[in-house]
């Protein structure tokens, strides 16, 4: 029994939800998203709630039950409030700048790294050492933040690199003589 899947999903105020077969659509103030639910899972719209249940008691259906509920809840949160990831840049001379829609990253390489931001995601740089990635699709926002972080992951000795704002870097001690 999925503890997450059992809970009904309430449709937030300001968001309209429709269920067409296995396709769940949500439209809100930030935009419009849809999610195609797996065939193993049954979706029902009842007034201002959406309930998700497995079609049968197979292991495959039960394993996709909770995930489907979470994905539907994420599209509701996305079209209502949106999602945001903050990245911090640590290191001497490491900085970021916007070049039109692209990000120019100076990360200690012999060249600057240019990252092309995909559509559906907005990037702002409040400070040269801070990047804010925001959008309505949680998966896409997280993917863009992970791709930017991958250019220079934080290293454990000095902590230089790009890290998530809430990430804690495990620091190591250097060599001893």
Swiss-Prot record:
GO terms for biological process: cytoplasmic translation. The keyword 4Fe-4S does not apply. The keyword Oxidoreductase does not apply. One of its GO terms (molecular function) is structural constituent of ribosome. Keywords: Ribonucleoprotein, Ribosomal protein, RNA-binding, rRNA-binding. Disulfide bonds: none annotated. Part of the 50S ribosomal subunit. This protein binds to the 23S rRNA, and is important in its secondary structure. It is located near the subunit interface in the base of the L7/L12 stalk, and near the tRNA binding site of the peptidyltransferase center. This is Large ribosomal subunit protein uL6. It comes from Bartonella henselae (strain ATCC 49882 / DSM 28221 / CCUG 30454 / Houston 1). The lineage of its organism: Bacteria, Pseudomonadati, Pseudomonadota, Alphaproteobacteria, Hyphomicrobiales. The gene is rplF.
């Amino acid at each position: 029994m999925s503890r997450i899947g059992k809970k009904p999903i309430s449709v937030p105020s300001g968001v309209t939800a429709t269920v067409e077969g296995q396709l769940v659509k949500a439209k809100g103030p930030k935009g419009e998203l849809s999610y195609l639910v797996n065939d193993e899972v049954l979706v029902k719209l009842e007034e201002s709630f959406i309930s998700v249940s497995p079609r049968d008691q197979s292991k495959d259906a039960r394993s996709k039950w909770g995930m489907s509920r979470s994905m539907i809840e994420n599209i509701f949160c996305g079209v209502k409030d949106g999602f945001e990831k903050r990245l911090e840049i640590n290191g001497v001379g490491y900085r970021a700048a916007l070049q039109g829609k692209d990000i120019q990253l100076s990360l200690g390489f012999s060249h600057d790294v240019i990252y092309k931001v995909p559509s559906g995601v907005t990037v702002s740089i409040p400070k040269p050492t801070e990047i804010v990635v925001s959008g309505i699709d949680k998966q896409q926002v997280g993917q863009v933040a992970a791709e930017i972080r991958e250019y220079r992951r934080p290293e454990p000795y000095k902590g230089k690199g790009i890290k998530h704002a809430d990430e804690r870097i495990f620091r190591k001690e250097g060599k001893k003589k």
